[in-house]
Amino acid sequence: QCMQLETSGQMRRCVSQCDKRFEEDIDWSKYDNQEDPQTECQQCQRRCRQQESDPRQQQYCQRRCKEICEEEEEYNRQRDPQQQYEQCQKRCQRRETEPRHMQICQQRCERRYEKEKRKQQKRYEEQQREDEEKYEERMKEGDNKRDPQQREYEDCRRHCEQQEPRLQYQCQRRCQEQQRQHGRGGDLMNPQRGGSGRYEEGEEKQSDNPYYFDERSLSTRFRTEEGHISVLENFYGRSKLLRALKNYRLVLLEANPNAFVLPTHLDADAILLVIGGRGALKMIHRDNRESYNLECGDVIRIPAGTTFYLINRDNNERLHIAKFLQTISTPGQYKEFFPAGGQNPEPYLSTFSKEILEAALNTQTERLRGVLGQQREGVIIRASQEQIRELTRDDSESRRWHIRRGGESSRGPYNLFNKRPLYSNKYGQAYEVKPEDYRQLQDMDVSVFIANITQGSMMGPFFNTRSTKVVVVASGEADVEMACPHLSGRHGGRGGGKRHEEEEEVHYEQVRARLSKREAIVVLAGHPVVFVSSGNENLLLFAFGINAQNNHENFLAGRERNVLQQIEPQAMELAFAASRKEVEELFNSQDESIFFPGPRQHQQQSPRSTKQQQPLVSILDFVGF
């Protein structure tokens, strides 16, 4: 019917209406659970035959089905969902010229990406269940099939449990030392040695670790070709042990060079940390607009309800930003509100009736249709260099236009690297901004921390006196160990029967995790922890800490800032049931402070030799994830 029209303009409009009708009629959600693209294609063609009575309309409908299914087959040739998504987006740009068709094509890409992520997660969960079943089968095989040395170690532990609580610690240490001598040490500082309990085969069961969040814990909130926004799993939803974080969420944003992030406001207070790149932030406070250039290490707060937008003003480098949110409407839940958009995001203005909008904006329906819902490219879009220059220039005519650096009295950004390192030596550097340093952090009572640990070195052990921290790996790999008194109850009681509170046994579970880029761990207040740079490069960490005011890091080793060294010798002698000389030799042998040579370095060189230590690469050289 379209081909019989006289003018090309009428023909294009007719074809566009056919396409629109076709896409709107097909309920793609019915096919989302299909594994085989050919099955999807056949169902699509069957739908065409059922709904279209005209043979030519059936032919057109089936041709569109075939095109879509061919795209699906090409899509499935790639194993990685991210690569599939990127190829799909490129195909949309190459084949589609009409904005409507482009949007439909991109929506198909989004559906396929989410479907593949669900399949990937399902495969992971099935593998986890299979591993757990195999582990349980091994445990049911009985003592006779277990390693004699492991059986001896477990017998030793059971013997310790029958002793008085004050003697159990030393007894358990003797068991561990005995097992180490047999080459199956429970020393978690050396993953290759193996371990006991649920870590018995040398690799920790990180799925049992409520404090560890791998990259699968990140869900994609928005994604376009120009970047993506991901949010970490709800802390309190993971475990009740993380109840202190039930009102907080962690968000990671990545934007390509010359990208523009649409204006929005949140029903949550937000603290932004620039991990890499150079950006610009615009915030609207009532009728005033404030603008700030952002650099690596900048920290700034965006109050709830403040409309803001971001620009990557660099031509070559991606912009990486971490956002720490404190929710205010629903604990642990937050929402974005976009005034402009299309279908994803949908503009909140479009939810009002046209009569209301016409009256509020003093305009006509035609103007509303010409503006609202026209932006089809998503939350993060590409801007021309001319548009970037216009958005980031210092416009003297703009109201309340501020280009300034932050400080104690400023609402502008505070740069972590403008102050001296909190701790620094050849093995690492650490920077931190606390509420007492930057007034914008006081209401939320949050601190922001960045550390650079050289390859093979370690930080700690130490504990935070008041603050619980969410620590994320920006680059490198980390072996993390933490002492936790809360997890020991998971493995059952030891003495049987109900005890009085004063007779309760004190036991700490050794919690460990291996973290890679974009993975996180929660360190609760008071929990001793250590971070080891275990990869082939320096380890770069950033962290957000709650309950930050008057928090201090108490270190348990080192020449300086070591709280154990401040305990009187007589008290140490009594506490450790060892001679004063032995205690002093143990706690006074380390010449460094805060950052130390790691376990492997310590084994390769004498404790006092540092000539072979690699030079420290400054954290200022770090440019992103």
UniProtKB/Swiss-Prot annotation:
Q: Name one GO molecular function term.
A: nutrient reservoir activity
| All residue ranges annotated as the Cupin type-1 domain in the record | 230-369, 414-584
| Ranges where the record places region Disordered | 120-152, 180-212, 594-614
Q: Which UniProt keywords apply?
A: Allergen, Antibiotic, Antimicrobial, Fungicide, IgE-binding protein, Plant defense, Secreted, Seed storage protein, Storage protein
Q: Where in the cell is it found?
A: Secreted
One Gene Ontology biological process: defense response to fungus
List the PANTHER family hit by this protein, alphabetically.
CUPINCIN (PTHR31189:SF13), OS03G0336100 PROTEIN-RELATED (PTHR31189)
Task: Return the protein name.
Answer: Vicilin-like antimicrobial peptides 2-3
- The organism is Macadamia integrifolia
